[in-house]
Amino acid sequence: MSPVQQAVVERVERLTWERIAPRASQYDAAGANPVDSWRDLWADGFLAGAIPRAYGGLGLDMATYIAVIRAIARGCASTAMTVHMHSTVMRFIDAVGTAEQKRHYFDEVVRHGKLFGSWGSEPAVSLSRTLLMETVIRRDPSGYVIDGVKHFCTMALGASYYMVWCALEGGTDMAKALQLALVPADAPGIATDGKWDTLGMRATFSPSVTFTGVRAAADGLLGDPGAAIQVGVIESFALGYAAVYLGIAESALAFALDYAKKRVVKPENIAVAADPTVQRHIGELAAQLDAAALVLADSAARWDGADLTELGPLANRAKYLTTEVGLHVTSKVIQVVGGRGAYKEFPAERAFRDLRTCTLMPPTVDRMLEAIGKSALGLDTAMFNVSGRRASRP
């Protein structure tokens, strides 16, 4: 990293440890949106990390952005994930939005600290299998109307705008019918069931939401139909997930290292760190995390200059490795620490819960391995199967 990039990462690391990490357990217990942490990140410019400098944002390159998300995740996984989802919406606006949409929505973030959610998941569809939307957007004389149900609606009741993934009425080929719509959170007809009592990632607050006759202005439609899967942004969801996974696992290992150095056992009166068995476990975990970190950093460094067909493989390999390594590390840390690792006053159990939960986000391990294998064989590099056709690229 250049000195400028490193300074950005160090700034968010300080903010994370001073302000964000101390709140993580409270937001986790409450299952509530981390609004104070969002406010702090906005004040320091990080809600505008993916917004171009011309619009007042930080304009971070992908390598720096991924390092920022990873750093936040070490302190609070839910805060990191919500900021990543919001930032990806900013990338969609930058990629397919009109000049007026960019001016208006970027200003909402830069000047007013507004957050944007991205809602694509649906109850009857597995995005790891097929990219298909059953939520319908239809035109009427006064604009557009949205009807449907969305699952895992991250930042519900917290974000100011929701980017809703819809299908044009009557459309089944998502390459032609997929339509993104930016909807204000206070639009009439939006109802949440309020249910989000999960194993982990509790502060992402992601209940189900029903849209009943929700009106969307014509200037709220983002991009042409099908554009969302043609501009190289959808793949960046998975790259950011990988950064969150790695940050969570790193926080778990950091706790184990601190514990092993400080915990003294009798009758030898020596630190746990002196035990060769513990040393071997720590060595295994450290080596695995280093390997996953290198792959993630390489994918991020290559991202901005990559061809669209390269983005899926870059994201898949990073997400796959950080998933497998992260799950192993967060489980093994509790084994190394022992009973204290199960106490909620310590961060290991939250890391275990958060990692196990957020690694369920698509694409799944099996789908990633399939895609990585096809790429290695010179076959299809698509990250998602698009309903209505087998796309050569997402």
State each model region's role.
Residues A21-A29, D290-L321, I334-A342:
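C-terminal helix-coil-helix/basic helical segment that borders enzyme active sites and/or dimer interfaces
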Residues V35-A43, L47-T154:
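Glycine-rich flavin
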Residues V149-A191:
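A short core secondary-structure module
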Residues H151-A156, F237-Y241, C358-M361:
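Glycine-rich phosphate/pyrophosphate-binding beta-alpha loops
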Residues W196-L289:
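Glycine-rich beta->alpha junctions and the first turn(s) of the following alpha-helix
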Residues E235-A238, A271-L285, L311-L321, E349-T357:
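Alpha-helical scaffold segments that form or flank carboxylate-/histidine-based iron centers
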Residues G339-P394:
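Glycine-rich phosphate/cofactor-binding loops in nucleotide/flavin-utilizing enzymes
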